[in-house]
A protein has these predicted regions:
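Extreme N-terminal basic, low-complexity initiation segments
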Residues: 2-12
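Non-catalytic, topology-defining segments of multipass membrane proteins
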Residues: 11, 35-150, 182-326, 398-451
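N-terminal chloroplast transit peptides
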Residues: 14-40
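Membrane-interface motifs of alpha-helical transmembrane segments
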Residues: 142-145, 165-179
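Transmembrane alpha-helical segments that form the membrane-embedded catalytic/substrate-channel core
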Residues: 147-159, 188-192, 253-268, 325-355, ...
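Acidic (Asp/Glu-rich) catalytic motifs at the cytosolic membrane interface
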Residues: 152-171, 192-205, 339, 343-347, ...
Length: 451
């Protein structure tokens, strides 16, 4: 797979679980059981020009044949469950439908966007230095952390593009930019480049997926993640709302460091992997050939950054460093997990067995969502144009909107876009995407309804 070879703003976010919960309760559409519902007629989708993400109009009805009566439905209305392996176009077919210039990288333009994200991030930091380090100023520090962490996510996305080879044809330059930006956010650049390439090559693969792989009911050891029964029991014990809050805390606050340190939410193939230590006692499966050396090179940058922060703490105090740097970093990490969670998970989006999986089928199980103009600007449309990114990750973000339009127009049967507001979708996923079960008839793993 070619991916294996690639260099791979809002203060209320601190209270995101509670806010999302309230919003979810106010907007329950899509959370109810849909007995006798109708599904999209795949040939009836009509394309609307304008926002490339919002391209699918109301479909004509057809009786469900592939969605169980007890399956919850998202804004996709079960669409992903009707897509068969034979429906998926080849990568060459999709690339042919995308305007040729969208596949080209412009180094100057990429550097300008990198400079914009860097400048915005530095401006936030400058504002933070003016906030007094007093308990009375805590509300201002919370607002600073939320806004700054949201803005810093733009730097994260720039580094993400560098890791994919979407930044520039000058690979040395893009590695320097990506390494510096990711290291500044305590992300091991080359380590994550490798694991993220695996994620792209095995999206929604139940065994070999690298992130957000669910636990399975009646799981087979070594093939599926075990623990589905336990998770469902926990959900029943806490209640749907209670467990949804637990899920939000675990994912948004702990999820990113847990993934880096022991491969949390990964599939069983790669075991307990560590992005900083590519040797035993951790699993080494994720780090073949040249990659252990690259992991160590990533570690040098992280150690250097930690050293700089420690030195700064001796000058201005540990509390000041935590307030200025660690607070925003928590929010940046929250945004990262939020995006990846919602890009590949919803109540009616399946995972696949090895027999049913193909690279392009996994790519077309990615979901585009609306995040609004502010977040789209700050985060370079990483959430609203992610389908095209999974089809060809070398498409730069400034061409992704046009590429998405082409994909949606030419492949409406398989392109997934859910217009549900992101905070409602987040609450729906947190409350209901707990564990999956295998449907032997079609090799799909579907979410077990939570009562």
């Amino acid at each position: 797979d070619p991916h294996e070879n690639l260099l791979e703003g809002s203060p209320f976010l601190m209270m995101l679980p509670a806010v999302a919960g309230l919003l979810g309760l106010l907007a329950p559409r899509g959370l109810t059981f849909r007995h006798g519902a109708t599904a999209p007629h795949h040939d009836a989708f009509k394309v609307k020009r304008g926002d490339p993400a919002m391209v699918v109009s109301e479909p004509l009805p057809r009786t469900f044949t592939s969605v169980a009566d007890d399956m919850l439905l998202s804004g996709l209305n079960g669409k992903a469950m009707f897509v068969e392996k034979a429906d998926i176009p080849t990568k060459a077919q999709v690339r042919a439908a995308i305007p040729a210039h969208c596949l080209k990288r412009n180094t100057l333009k990429s550097m300008i966007y990198a400079a914009i994200s860097l400048t915005q991030s530095a401006a936030c930091l400058a504002v933070g230095t003016q906030i007094p380090l007093k308990v009375a100023a805590l509300p201002f520090w919370l607002a600073y952390a939320a806004v700054s962490g949201t803005v810093w996510t733009g730097m994260w996305v720039v580094a993400h593009e560098c890791g994919h080879g979407a930044f520039s044809d000058n690979r040395a330059l893009q590695d320097v930019v990506g390494y510096v930006f990711h290291t500044a956010l305590l992300v091991p650049y080359f380590s994550w480049q490798r694991s993220h390439a695996v994620h792209h090559s095995r999206t929604n693969h139940i065994t070999e997926g690298e992130t957000h792989v669910p636990v399975v009911v009646n799981a087979r050891e070594g093939i599926e993640n075990t623990g589905g029964e336990l998770e469902l029991d926990n959900a029943k014990r806490f209640g749907k709302v209670g467990w949804g809050l637990v899920q939000l805390v675990l994912h948004l606050l702990i999820g990113w460091p847990a993934y880096l340190l022991w491969g949390a939410t990964g599939g069983p193939k790669y075991g307990t992997s560590n992005h900083f230590v590519p040797v035993k006692p951790f699993s080494t499966t994720l780090w073949p050939n040249k990659w252990p050396k690259k992991v160590w090179r990533s570690d040098l940058g992280i150690l250097g950054m930690l050293g700089m922060l420690s030195l700064l703490a001796t000058k201005i105090g540990a509390a000041a460093v935590f307030a200025l740097y660690c607070g925003p970093l928590i929010f940046t990490n929250m945004w990262l997990v939020l995006y990846t969670w919602l890009q590949h998970t919803d109540v009616d989006v399946p995972h696949l067995t090895n027999e049913e999986f193909t690279y392009m089928r996994g790519a077309f199980l990615t979901i585009d969502r609306p995040y609004g103009p502010v977040f789209d600007w700050l985060h370079h449309r990483i959430g609203s144009t992610h389908v095209c990114h999974h089809i060809d990750c070398t498409i730069p973000h400034y061409h992704a909107r046009e590429a998405t339009q082409a994909i949606a127009e030419n492949f409406p049967k398989v392109y997934l876009y859910d217009s549900t507001p992101w905070f409602q979708a987040l609450w729906r996923v947190a409350c209901n995407c707990i564990a999956v079960k295998l449907r032997p008839s079609d090799g799909r793993y579907t979410w077990v309804p939570v009562s």
